[in-house]
């Protein structure tokens, strides 16, 4: 596993805390009953292991059954052992949600102006604004606020305002020299006006100002329009991860 991939895997786990986490012979089991976040409710096979693989899979299946959760594995091409994905497929686990992780070395891109109307918010205020932008009650994002607050990451909750209207929101998170771009959202009626691109550029500049060396993000592999936007900003694919699930 390349060092970028391993470090990004560790960082993305840090960015989404779990209620309970267990290390098991190189695998990380995470449990968060009530949360829909798969990264917080899955096994990440990140480090070398020594035990027999089929027995380990059975152990994980029982652990998640005991927790009242489906068994999910979060995998990439470098997951260990190498045959794990094939073994899970043979057990009937479906492959879902392939997601591309993209990286931007900040020293390789020229600085750009931060968009007018871009602002870094207090986390509680951002939750309120983001909930309203998505048309959801604030309570629906309360669990998200708690996960963010408990994660070992420096957060930069941001919004973009145009003509006194919040048109886009997102959040940046710095972990060491890496700065992640998360949850960029623009309502359907306000899309195709460049707001998400403006917010992404402003977050990249926030990353630079914070002292980070790299910006990174995760995007649905099938989301061609979003991928093209990020590629124009200089992001390059590093690896893809996916889930194997019993459900």
What are these regions (language model features)?
Residues 1-66, 80, 139-140:
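N-terminal charged segments
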Residues 1-9, 44, 99, 108-147, ...:
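Short amphipathic alpha-helix that is part of the acyltransferase structural core
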Residues 21-25, 77, 83-94, 154-170, ...:
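Conserved beta-hairpin
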Residues 53-128, 134, 138, 244-245:
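Acyl-donor-binding surface of acyltransferase catalytic domains
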Residues 67-77, 207-218:
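Conserved GNAT acetyl-CoA-binding A-motif
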Residues 139-189:
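A conserved beta-strand-loop-helix scaffold within acyl/acetyltransferase catalytic domains
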């Amino acid at each position: 596993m390349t060092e970028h991939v391993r470090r990004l895997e560790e960082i993305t786990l840090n960015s989404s805390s779990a209620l309970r986490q267990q290390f098991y012979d190189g695998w990380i089991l995470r449990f968060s009953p009530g949360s829909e976040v798969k990264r917080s409710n899955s096994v990440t096979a990140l480090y070398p292991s020594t035990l027999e693989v089929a027995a380990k899979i059975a152990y994980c299946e029982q652990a998640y059954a005991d927790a009242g959760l489906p068994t999910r594995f979060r995998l990439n091409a470098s997951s260990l052992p190498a045959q794990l994905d094939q073994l899970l497929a043979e057990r009937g686990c479906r492959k879902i949600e392939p997601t591309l992780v993209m990286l931007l070395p900040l020293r390789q891109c020229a600085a750009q102006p931060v968009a007018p109307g871009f602002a870094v918010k207090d986390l509680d205020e951002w939750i309120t604004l983001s909930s309203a932008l998505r048309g959801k009650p604030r309570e629906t994002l309360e669990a998200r606020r708690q996960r963010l607050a408990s994660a070992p990451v420096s957060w930069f909750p941001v919004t973009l305002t145009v003509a006194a209207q919040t048109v886009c929101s997102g959040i940046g998170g710095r972990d060491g020299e890496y700065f992640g771009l998360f949850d960029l959202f623009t309502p359907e009626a306000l899309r195709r006006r460049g707001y998400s691109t403006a917010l992404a550029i402003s977050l990249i500049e926030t990353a630079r100002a914070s002292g980070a060396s790299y910006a990174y993000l995760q995007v649905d592999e099938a989301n061609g329009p979003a991928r093209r936007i990020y590629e124009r900003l200089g992001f390059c694919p590093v690896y893809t991860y996916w889930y194997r699930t019993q459900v």
